[in-house]
Amino acid sequence: MELLRQGEHLHSTSRSTLESKCRKYKLIMQNDGNLVLYIGSLKSQSDEYCLWSSASCGKGHGPYRLSMQEDGNLVIYDSRNSAIWASGTMGHGVRGHYSMKLRSSGQIVVYDKYKQILYSSKPCTRDHLLSLPCAKPSGHPQSAYPPQQPGYGYPAQPGYPPQPGYPPQHGYPPQHGYPQQPGYY
């Protein structure tokens, strides 16, 4: 199944998943409350890598469910019916027949009834693939993101490490992605 229609759910207890049409990407509502997009085979954990996470691991009380609501919002609820993550698409677009699709590009997309995109994660490209294993469905879960990062889009790309012998610059802020040398702004 690659589509979650309005009124449908993914449950953390049922091991239900969404799988892209090409069978390359899997979206899993995990027992720890984390909604995670994986690339690779679920048959072999060594071939499975995390691409995106809702960063809702450990929030609320399990079991959890992902719901495509009638108002257009994609929401993760805990067992006490408290929302622990949402796409923020409530009331957007043309009302009725909302759906969430896992595209063959590795994108999670929420549509209205006229296929207008209300929410989208970034497409998965070779440049963005992570080589770090992430929360395994059958293992001990870890968060897919460090605590300071948001639970949508791709994790921040690592920057250059500080260069030895170069003190931090004062004055103009450094350009992201480029190491700064003393006296250069």
UniProtKB/Swiss-Prot annotation:
Main subcellular location of this protein, as a coarse class: Golgi
Biased composition (Pro residues): 158-171
Post-translational modification: The N-terminus is blocked.
GO molecular-function terms, A-Z: actin filament binding; actin monomer binding; D-mannose binding; identical protein binding
Region (Disordered) location: 138-185
GO annotation terms (biological process): actin filament bundle assembly; defense response to bacterium; hyperosmotic response; phagocytosis; response to bacterium; response to cAMP; response to cycloheximide; response to other organism
Region feature 5 X 6 AA tandem repeats of G-Y-P-X-Q-[PH], mapped onto this chain: 153-182
Keywords of the record: Actin-binding, Cytoplasm, Cytoskeleton, Golgi apparatus, Lectin, Membrane, Repeat
Positions with biased composition (Low complexity): 141-157, 172-185
GO cellular component: cell-cell junction; cytoskeleton; endosome; Golgi apparatus; Golgi membrane; Golgi-associated vesicle membrane; lipid droplet; phagocytic vesicle
Sequence repeats: 153-158, 159-164, 165-170, 171-176, 177-182
SMART domains for this protein: B_lectin (SM00108)
Membrane topology: Peripheral membrane protein
Subcellular location: Golgi apparatus membrane; Endomembrane system; Cytoplasm, Cytoskeleton
Domain Bulb-type lectin: 1-123
Function: May have a role in cell motility. It has high affinity for both G-actin and F-actin. Binds to vesicle membranes via mannose residues and, by way of its interaction with actin, links these membranes to the cytoskeleton.
Quaternary structure (record): Homodimer in solution.
Protein name: Comitin
Annotated source species: Dictyostelium discoideum
Gene: comA
